[in-house]
Amino acid sequence: ALCAAALLRAEPLIRPDRVYLLGHSMGGMLAPRIDAEGGAFAGLIFWAGTPRTLDALILEQNEASLAAMPPEQRAAAAPLVQALREQFAALPRMAEEDAQHTHILGNLWAWYFKEILTHPPEEYLRRLTKPVLVLQGDRDAHLSVERDFRRYEALLAAHPDAAFHLYPGLNHLFMPSPTGAIAE
C-alpha cells in the first residue's frame, strides 16, 4: 500500500494530496497502522473492517460456528476452539524464535499473529486526525454491527471528520444478503 501510494503521488495527473487508503476486511483493520507507518494518506476508508484485534475476531467467528453446529459435531469441535483460544493466549509470552517455528490455524505461523497483535487497531484509531470513512453492511457474517461498526463510532466519536455508513441488507462483500449467511 505504501509503495502503491508513492507511485500514485508520482503520477503527474494525480494530486498527491488526494491519495486515500481504502482497506477492506483485514485491510480495514490494518489501514490505520499502514498510514501511521508512513502512508501520508489524505484520509482512510474502512470497508468492512474492524477495530478489534485479529485473535478476538477469529475466536468469535469460531465460537459462532461452534454454536451453530449440531451437538455431536460441537462436542468434537469444541476442543479445537479451546486449543486455538489457548494458542492465542500464549502468544504474548512466546519467544520470537519459537513463534517462527510454531503454526496456528493450520499452516499460519505464530510469529505473524504475534506481530500483528502487538499493534492493536484501537491505538492507531485514537490518534487519527485525518478524514475517516467507515462502511459496513448490516448482514456481514464476519463482523458485528455492535462490536465492530458501533465500536468504530465510539472510538471516533470526537473525531471532527469521521463519517459512518451502515448499509442495510449487505454482506461482507457489500452484496445483497437476505439472511446474512456466509454462503450468500
What annotation goes with each model-predicted range?
Residues I14-G23:
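Alpha/beta-hydrolase fold nucleophile elbow
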Residues G28-G39:
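Short glycine-enriched nucleophile-adjacent loop
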Residues G23-S25, A48:
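Catalytic nucleophile serine of serine hydrolases
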Residues K130, A141-L155:
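Short alpha-helix in the alpha/beta-hydrolase fold that links the catalytic acid
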Residues A1-E11:
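Alpha/beta-hydrolase active-site loop
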Residues L128, V134-Q136:
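Short beta-strand/loop motif that positions the catalytic acidic residue
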Residues L156-T179:
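Catalytic histidine neighborhood in serine/cysteine hydrolases
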Residues G43-R127:
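Accessory cap/linker subdomain of secreted extracellular hydrolases
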